[in-house]
Amino acid sequence: MSNRFAVILAAGKGTRMKSKLYKVLHPVCGKPMVQHVVDQVSQLGLQKLVTVVGHGAEMVQEQLGNVSEFALQAEQLGTAHAVDQAASVLANEEGTTLVICGDTPLITAETMEALLQQHKEAGAMATVLTAYIEEPAGYGRIVRNENGHVEKIVEHKDANEKELAIKEINTGTYCFDNKALFASLSKVSNDNVQGEYYLPDVIEILKNEGHIVSAYQTEHFDETLGVNDRVALSQAEIIMKNRINRKNMVNGVTIIDPSNTYISADAIIGSDTVLHPGTIIEGNTVIGSDCEIGPHTVIRDSEIGDRTTIRQSTVHDSKLGTEVSVGPFAHIRPDSVIGDEVRVGNFVEIKKTVFGNRSKASHLSYIGDAQVGEDVNLGCGSITVNYDGKNKFKTVIGNGVFIGCNSNLVAPVTVEDGAYVAAGSTITENVPSKALSVARARQVNKEDYVDQLLNKKKS
């Protein structure tokens, strides 16, 4: 197999997005558009990948890191001009170069591989990825000769009446013989309505020089969708969402209502897990097998063990063990590690806490900056008082501890193994192992007080 290279065009302004965020960084199913493209082309066995950047170059470089080399298009003078910016990296290379836009997040490695294979089998100098659509307005048209070979590509604004009637369109993805590509770029003129250097003109140049120009027509037009505004962004989101949901269902995940379930492109979900409506799974989340998630649950960048149930709750940047029960209406905040067989009940908030195996906080509690041992019971209304207005402090609760209802543990404080804290206590000092700590005012009953008070008011 000959050397393979790719150029991703990601320098456009994206003015139609009407956004401060650089266009190719707008997310589709939780991942920037250009990252989707890079992830797919990276499966093609490339020797070099060059991303052409312009506006927001630093942000794109930060997003992609060292998986790509970069070329700067300081002034946007057209797609041919953009590709030419990669000349310093690629111009002297022997092989085949794929050119693709960074705002086409739906393109798949399978389609690009088919394009490359067509290019090789045809012995072509250039091969165009095309599609057939009923309403081609706005797209460049594929003009073929009497033998069915690609003659040229005409941009919509430059097309005559006959050419506008053509329904085979240019998707903006190509592959070229690398040296032929860069030799032709210098011959491209900007004598057109837009005054730009169009990459499709390379097709006509190569054709006029007697080279073979081939085309591969994809049956999956949705893969070629270019995102130029928020409407197209929403269309891409829907298509990608459906693709991800279908993949998970084929792999053994039950999704009760796919139209109301959102799964990020990088999430991994085990078989026999059930996702209820309103479930949103974001980022690099990993969910085990036989889990039940939702309804109305958000999980972001977290790891969920097998046979865990999360109902109407939020989990962010945390790790949950096996057979954990969360919710309804619980909130597990970042940097929490929840053990196996744990119960986190309704209206419980846990933040930056290690919560041991088989421990329970079943209702109305806040556990923050804490280390909770195994087999601990935190009664309703248990609070770790971790913040003094300036600093956060840690609470340590040992194994087998029982915390009574409506208790405050004022950090820094330690409750040692096997200790009990009486309901209603405010603990400000360490509690020894197996001790009972009572820290509340003694109850005083005043006999006949109410009658005396009422009689006094009457008089």
Swiss-Prot record:
What reaction is this protein's catalytic activity?
alpha-D-glucosamine 1-phosphate + acetyl-CoA = N-acetyl-alpha-D-glucosamine 1-phosphate + CoA + H(+); N-acetyl-alpha-D-glucosamine 1-phosphate + UTP + H(+) = UDP-N-acetyl-alpha-D-glucosamine + diphosphate
Give the UniProt entry's GO cellular component terms. cytoplasm; membrane
Q: Where is this region: N-acetyltransferase?
A: 252-459
Q: Where is this region: Pyrophosphorylase?
A: 1-230
UniProt cross-references to Pfam families, sorted A to Z: Hexapep, NTP_transferase
> Which cofactors are required for activity?
Mg(2+)
Region spans: Linker: 231-251
Positions with a binding annotation for Mg(2+): 103, 228
Q: What detail does the entry give on cofactor binding?
A: Binds 1 Mg(2+) ion per subunit.
Q: Which domain of life is it from?
A: Bacteria
Q: Indicate the enzyme's highest-level EC class.
A: transferase
* Intracellular or extracellular location(s): Cytoplasm
Q: Name one GO biological process term.
A: UDP-N-acetylglucosamine biosynthetic process
| Its EC number(s) | 2.7.7.23, 2.3.1.157
- The entry marks the following residues as binding UDP-N-acetyl-alpha-D-glucosamine, namely 9-12, 23, 73, 78-79, 140, 155, 170, 228, 333, 351, 366, 377
Q: Which PROSITE patterns match?
A: HEXAPEP_TRANSFERASES
Concerning InterPro entries, the annotation shows: Bifunctional_GlmU, GlmU-like, GlmU_C_LbH, Hexapep, Hexapep_transf_CS, NTP_transferase_dom, Nucleotide-diphossugar_trans, Trimer_LpxA-like_sf
How this chain assembles, per its entry, is: Homotrimer.
The family classification in the record reads:
In the N-terminal section; belongs to the N-acetylglucosamine-1-phosphate uridyltransferase family.
Please explain the role this protein plays, according to its UniProt record: Catalyzes the last two sequential reactions in the de novo biosynthetic pathway for UDP-N-acetylglucosamine (UDP-GlcNAc). The C-terminal domain catalyzes the transfer of acetyl group from acetyl coenzyme A to glucosamine-1-phosphate (GlcN-1-P) to produce N-acetylglucosamine-1-phosphate (GlcNAc-1-P), which is converted into UDP-GlcNAc by the transfer of uridine 5-monophosphate (from uridine 5-triphosphate), a reaction catalyzed by the N-terminal domain.
Specify the protein name: Bifunctional protein GlmU
Q: Which organism is it from?
A: Bacillus cereus (strain AH187)
Corresponding gene? glmU
